[in-house]
Design a protein with these regions (language model features):
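Alpha-helical transmembrane segments and their membrane-interface boundaries
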Residues: 1-283, 291-334
């Protein structure tokens, strides 16, 4: 069990905090029977900032607060921009190109910095799945901000009441931007994958098509071994998770039972990402299906589409990895 889930004090606190805050926003969705998806974005903001906090869970409360707030504002802006430029293929591709090189050149940096950039880019990609005008884009970013800030506030309150020893020195940071050959090839390869995925999503006007570039973003690592592991875990976790998520999405109609499942899967999703990517994806698949079900979206159709788009994203990454190996060989001969 310890191979798949982390149940140390810091992890449990993050999992419980995320469950409480996401539970609060989603219970409002249930009780008030809201017909909009703004509550979903508040829950999403909470969830993503919780994932970011995983990488800084052993730092001081002060550092986690400052780093968390900075990250929150950046990711809220990113999701707003993604929503606004979601149908603008050229602008969206240029922004993804910029993110690709930021991710590529900071991949060898400190996890706080590298993961922060990665999750901000992830929020931009998620935003592209919700086409909106200026007003709605701002509202999407605002509710994301509210949900994330609520998480940080609750987390800080809990941490101040519980004594936890800091394992890391806050003064030590390894923020490096390395435009070497390996990082450049990785950035170019990642940008190619993201742009292809984004093109497929926008050109064919696919509902939740953003899942294709998002899959590329999350499984494409700087080296083949890590990418292969991420591909395997992503595929297996999504397939097994879908076997549970799809029947739940079809047959469950009681909003309160759906909410309870969402509450539980939130906790396990946060605790699993620390230990095992595959188990994280398994619980994430169920989490997403239940979250969308509460937002009056088709959890079944989206879960099935998500499985298909995950496979497409994996095929894109695998193809580019094979091609980039040949490019790397040619460049090293020059």
């Amino acid at each position: 069990m310890s191979k798949y889930i982390c149940l140390k004090k810091n992890s449990i606190i993050l999992g419980i905090t995320a469950s409480l805050v996401i539970g609060f926003f989603t219970v409002l969705q249930v009780v008030l029977d809201l017909q909009n998806i703004y509550g979903l974005f508040a829950a999403l903001g909470c969830f993503v900032v919780a994932l970011h906090q995983v990488s800084i869970r052993n730092h001081s409360i002060k550092f986690r607060l400052y780093a968390g707030v900075l990250f929150i504002f950046c990711m809220s802006i990113a999701i707003s921009l993604g929503s606004y430029y979601s149908h603008d293929l050229i602008t969206s591709s240029l922004i993804l190109l910029g993110f690709s090189f930021l991710i590529g050149y900071t991949a060898k940096s400190d996890l706080v910095f590298a993961n922060g950039i990665l999750f901000i880019a992830d929020m931009y990609v998620i935003g592209t799945g919700f086409n909106a005008d200026v007003t709605d884009s701002i509202l999407i970013g605002l509710f994301t901000l509210i949900g994330a800030l609520a998480f940080i506030i609750v987390l800080v309150v809990i941490l101040k009441k519980i004594s936890i020893k800091n394992a890391f020195d806050d003064n030590y940071r390894s923020i490096r931007i390395l435009p070497d050959i390996d990082s450049t090839i990785y950035a170019i390869s990642l940008s190619l994958g993201l742009i292809i995925g984004n093109f497929i999503s926008i050109y064919f006007d696919i509902e939740i098509g953003y899942w294709i570039p998002m899959t590329v973003l999350l499984i494409f690592k700087p080296d083949v071994i890590r990418s292969s592991t991420a591909i395997k875990h992503r595929l297996i976790g999504t397939v097994i998770g879908s076997l549970f998520a799809i029947p739940l999405a079809i047959y469950l109609s009681n909003a309160y039972i759906i909410w309870m499942i969402l509450f539980i899967t939130t906790f396990f999703t946060i605790c699993c990402i620390i230990k095992h990517y595959g188990s994280y994806v398994f619980f994430l698949t169920i989490f997403i299906a239940m979250l969308l079900k509460l937002a009056h979206l088709s959890g079944y159709e989206i879960s099935l589409s998500r499985l298909i788009y995950t496979v497409i994203g994996i095929v894109i990454v695998a193809t580019i990895i094979i091609l980039s190996k040949n490019i790397r060989t040619i460049l090293k001969r020059i």
